[in-house]
Regions:
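Helix-loop-strand module that forms the ligand-binding subsite of alpha/beta enzymes
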Residues: 1-65
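Glycine-rich phosphate/pyrophosphate-binding loop and the adjoining helix
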Residues: 56-109
């Protein structure tokens, strides 16, 4: 996880203690400089504090066609971008679909 994000999350103790984020939907996304550059580990490290907050973390279901692509980013934990190149169409589409799911569930809370 990037240091600025970690620093921000460390300032959310009051929200955690008050339970203000419980049942709020959340999702994560990331980029890495190589295909096996730790995409999953980065996403999981970002999910941990969200789960501690009691948030409802969603990822990309295996029905997402982007997960079948092997030449770029994308994991069940969230969309990723292989930043060695420009954004690939399937990476952008996965991020858009996850954003749509997040927006849909946000209307219910």
């Amino acid at each position: 996880m990037a240091a600025p994000l970690k620093g921000f999350l460390e300032t959310t103790s009051d929200l955690w203690l008050s339970g203000a984020m419980i049942d709020k939907p959340a999702a994560v996304f990331a980029s890495a400089s190589s295909l096996h550059g730790g995409h999953e580990a980065v996403l999981q490290s970002m999910m941990t504090p969200l789960l501690h907050h009691g948030m409802l973390v969603m990822g990309c279901p295996y029905s997402d066609p982007g997960l079948a692509m092997t030449e770029g980013g994308g994991t069940p934990y969230g969309p990723t971008h292989l930043d060695a190149d420009s954004l690939r169409p399937h990476e952008e589409a996965m991020a858009h679909r996850l954003g749509q799911r997040l927006a849909k569930w946000s209307q219910h809370v």
